[in-house]
Design a protein with these regions (language model features):
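Long, charge-rich, low-complexity intrinsically disordered regions
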Residues: 1-75
């Protein structure tokens, strides 16, 4: 997640709404698992913009997923 402070998005007042919306998406758990298993192993510094482009998902979903995976990794 190269040079990108994902935390700056978390401070936005609509962050919780974005997270709630992404979690309601049917393919969210599958996208998250795929990103963790396939994409981050090969490209650990990929940006959420590149994830969104490569998987043809919304930037919001990519942002939430990368933030959650980064957070899980540090815990």
């Amino acid at each position: 997640m190269k040079g990108l402070s994902l935390e700056k998005y978390v401070d936005n007042p609509v962050w919780t709404i974005l997270v709630e919306t992404v979690h309601k998406m049917i393919l969210y758990p599958h996208h998250k698992a795929y990103i963790q298993r396939e994409i981050l192993n090969k490209h650990p510094d990929i940006s959420f913009q590149d994830v969104a482009l490569n998987l043809e998902i919304s930037r919001g979903e990519a942002l939430v997923i990368l933030y959650e995976l980064k957070k899980e990794k540090t815990e």
